[in-house]
Amino acid sequence: MSEQGGLTPTILEEGQTEPESAPENGILKSESLDEEEKLELQRRLAAQNQERRKSKSGAGKGKLTRSLAVCEESSARSGGESHQDQESIHLQLSSFPSLQEEDKSRKDDSEREKEKDKNREKLSERPKIRMLSKDCSQEYTDSTGIDLHGFLINTLKNNSRDRMILLKMEQEMIDFIADSNNHYKKFPQMSSYQRMLVHRVAAYFGLDHNVDQTGKSVIINKTSSTRIPEQRFCEHLKDEKSEESQKRFILKRDNSSIDKEDNQNRMHPFRDDRRSKSIEEREEEYQRVRERIFAHDSVCSQESLFLDNSRLQEDMHICNETYKKRQLFRAHRDSSGRTSGSRQSSSETELRWPDHQRAWSSTDSDSSNRNLKPTMTKTASFGGITVLTRGDSTSSTRSAGKLSKTGSESSSSAGSSGSLSRTHPQSTALTSSVAAGSPGCMAYSENGMGGQVPPSSTSYILLPLESATGIPPGSILLNPHTGQPFVNPDGTPAIYNPPGSQQTLRGTVGGQPQQPPQQQPSPQPQQQVQASQPQMAGPLVTQREELAAQFSQLSMSRQSSGDTPEPPSGTVYPASLLPQTAQPQSYVITSAGQQLSTGGFSDSGPPISQQVLQAPPSPQGFVQQPPPAQMSVYYYPSGQYPTSTSQQYRPLASVQYSAQRSQQIPQTTQQAGYQPVLSGQQGFQGMMGVQQSAHSQGVMSSQQGAPVHGVMVSYPTMSSYQVPMTQGSQAVPQQTYQPPIMLPSQAGQGSLPATGMPVYCNVTPPNPQNNLRLMGPHCPSSTVPVMSASCRTNCGNVSNAGWQVKF
C-alpha cells in the first residue's frame, strides 16, 4: 500500500508536466514569432522529451524522476523572452479550458477505479461472513433468501403429512442439540422434498447441514450459532387452532349478538302469527283474498263456463245424432239393399249444417260439392283394416245400386294386397278389402255422377296387384265405354278358368255400376254384381231392370240384403287415375248396345242376375265421338272359386244382340255380311276378344237376335301392364306384353264344340290412329274364331281364320 501511495503523487506530477508541454507545442504553432525563437523552442522541447524517455527507462518500475520545470530554464533567458512565453502560456490555458477539465476527469477516473478495487476486495470478504450469519437462525432466512419462519408455519398449517414430519424433525434436532457428546447427526435416506425440509429446519435451528456422498442423506453439525427456537412448532399449531376457534366463535357471536331483544321483538310477532294460524285459517284467508281479487271477473267466468258447457253438450248431441244416422243407414242398407236413403240422409245433414262445414258421414256423396281427398291404406301385412271412402253410388233417386261398406269382413284376410282409392272433384271411388286365399282381387268402378251435374270427362282407375306369382283364374273384362260385362242368360257373369289350372270358378264376381257422364240428365239406375266365395251361406239375388240407356259403365261392389247375407270375406277394389302398372289375370269383354241375357253356371254356385245400364246417346257420348281413345282394362280375378269339373275352361255366359239396339249404333266395320260382335267402332274400343255362334255368313247376317257366346278370356302370369282409356286429355303410360286369350264355346248351342282355342292378343301402346277396326274374314262354323289384337300391326299370321282387331 505504501508503494501505491508513493506512485500516485508521481503520476500526478507527471500529469501536471505533460499538460504544460502540450501548450508549448500549441504556442509554437499558433503564435506568430520570429523564426529563430521558433527554432529554439523546438530544440528545447525535443531535448526535454529525450530526457523524459531516458528517465523513464533508467528509473525502473515504480521509480519516477522529476523533470525540469519550464520556468527554470526560462529564468536564464532574457526578461523579454520569458515574459512573452508566460503570456503565451496563460493565453493558451485561458483559450483551452477543456484541457484542464480533461486532466481533472482523468484524475477522478483513476481514483474511482482504485476505490472500486478496494471496495471489491472488501465485499469479497464480507459475503463470507454474511453467509455464515444466514445459516444461523438468527435472521430466520435460508441461503436462498426464503423466510424460514413463514415457510414452516405454512407447512404446518396446510399439509398434515408434512406437519408430522416437521414435528418429528424438530424433536430429533432438539435431542441432538441437548446431547453434548454427539457433534453431528446423519438422517436416513429420504426423498428430495423431505431433504429440503431437513435443510430448512436445520437452518432454522442454526445447525450446519450438508449432504453425504450418496446425496440422499442429510448430515447436520453443531455450530456456534446453534440454538433452540423460543416457540415450538406445536405452539404455532395451537395458536392457529385457537385463532380458528375464536373466528368461528366470533362468527357465532356476531350472528347472535345483534340486539337480542330487538330481534326477539321483531321475530316473535311473525312466529306467533305463523304458529297460531292453522291450515283452515290459511285457506279462509286465501279465499277471502281471492274473492276480493276476482270479484269483478266472477260473473264473466260463470257466463263463459256456461257457454262452454252448452257447446260441449251441443257437440255431444251432434256426434250422437251422426252416430245414430250411421247406424240407421247401415240397418236400412242391410234391410233394403238400396242406397236411395244415402242421398236423403246426406241432404238432410247438409240442411242442418248451413253455416259451417258439416261433420263427416258415411252417407256423403259428390252431390255435397265437397272436394274429397284420396285416402290410402296399406293392408299388405294385415287384413283387419279396410278403407271406406265417401262416394255417391247413385245418379238418380230411383237406383238399384248400393254403397259398398267393408267393415270387418276382411278381418280374416291373410294375404292381401294394397288398396288405393282416389276421388275426383265430382266423383268418388268405392273401396273394399282384399279377400283371403288369393294374391289379389280387384273390382274397378267408374265414379258415377249425379244426373244434375254433367261432367266434362270420366277417368278410369287401375290398381296394381302386389303379388307377382299365383294369379287366380277367372276374370271379367269391362268395356271402358259401357262398363258392361258378358253374362250368362241367367245374369251371372261369364268366368273362365285358364288352361294351366284344372279348377273352374263357382263364385261370382260382384261389382257396383256407375254411369258415365251424360249431358242430358236422365234416370240411370245402376247394375249390381255380387262377389261370393266358397264360404257363402246363401244365394245372391239381385234385381234386373231394363233401362233405356245405350251406354253405361259398370263398377263392382258387394250387396247385402235381408235375405242375402254378405260374403264373409269379399274384396272390391276401386279404380284410380294413377299411372301404375297392374298384373291383370283374365278378362271378360263387354260391349255397348248389348242386352246381356242371363244364364246359369254349369256346376257352379247360385245364379246372379245382371242389370244392364244404358243411357241415350249424347253429343259427347262415346258412340258419336270418332277421336282415338285408349282401351281401359278392368278385371276381377276369382281364382279362389274351385269347382268339381275337370275342364280347363267353361262357357258360362252367352250374349244376345237385339236388332233394335244394334241398329241404333253406327256399324262401320261390317264386312261380307257378317254381324260384328262389336256393334260400333267408337263404342267398342275396349273389346279384347269375342266369340260367335254363327255357322256361316248368312247366319250372322240374318240372325241379329241370335245369342252370342260369352267371351271368356284368361291371362296367365305375365309382366304387369295397364291399358287405360283416354278421354279428353287423360292418358296413362302402358307396358306391352302378349298374353294368350281363350275364347271358349258353349256346348249345346249351334254346332260349336265344347272345346276352346287360345286367342293370342298383343296389347301394345296405341299409335295416334288407334280407332278400333274389325275385319271379319270367313270363319268356319266348326271352329272357334281366333282374334289377334295389335296396336301397331295387323296380326294376320294365325292358324285359324278369325276376327282381326286393329287399334
Swiss-Prot record:
Subcellular location field: Cytoplasm
Stretches of Polar residues bias are at 89-98, 359-380, 422-434, 552-563, 595-613
Question: Per the annotation, which location comes first and is thus the protein's main one?
Answer: cytoplasm
Q: Low complexity compositional bias: what residue ranges?
A: 337-348, 401-421, 525-535
Q: Does the keyword Iron apply?
A: no
Residues recorded with modification Asymmetric dimethylarginine:
650
Q: Output compositional bias ranges, type Basic and acidic residues.
A: 101-127, 349-358
Effect ascribed to mutating residue 650 to A = Abolishes methylation, no effect on subcellular location
**One GO term of the cellular component aspect?**
cytoplasm
SMART domains in the cross-refs: R3H
Q: Which residues carry this modification: N-acetylserine?
A: 2
- Modified residue Phosphoserine is at which positions? 32, 55, 133, 298, 361, 381, 557
| InterPro entries xref list | R3H_dom, R3H_dom_sf, R3H_domain_containing, SUZ
**Region described as Disordered: spans on this chain:** 1-127, 245-282, 328-434, 474-536, 552-576, 595-627
Which positions are tagged coiled coil?
32-57
One Pfam match, given by its short name, reads: R3H
The domain of life is Eukaryota
How is it modified post-translationally?
Answer: Phosphorylation of isoform 2 at Ser-55 is enhanced upon dopamine D1 receptor activation and favors interaction with CALM1.
Q: Which GO terms describe its molecular function?
A: calmodulin binding; nucleic acid binding
Give GO BP annotations, semicolon-separated: cellular response to heat
Q: Where is the composition biased (Pro residues)?
A: 514-524
Keywords, in A-Z order: Acetylation, Calmodulin-binding, Coiled coil, Cytoplasm, Methylation, Phosphoprotein
Question: Quick check: keyword Kinase in the entry?
Answer: no
Query: Where is the R3H domain positioned along the sequence?
Result: 163-226
Q: Quote the subunit structure annotation.
A: Interacts with CALM1.
Protein name stated in the entry = cAMP-regulated phosphoprotein 21
Which species is this record about? Mus musculus
The lineage, from the top, is: Eukaryota, Metazoa, Chordata, Craniata, Vertebrata
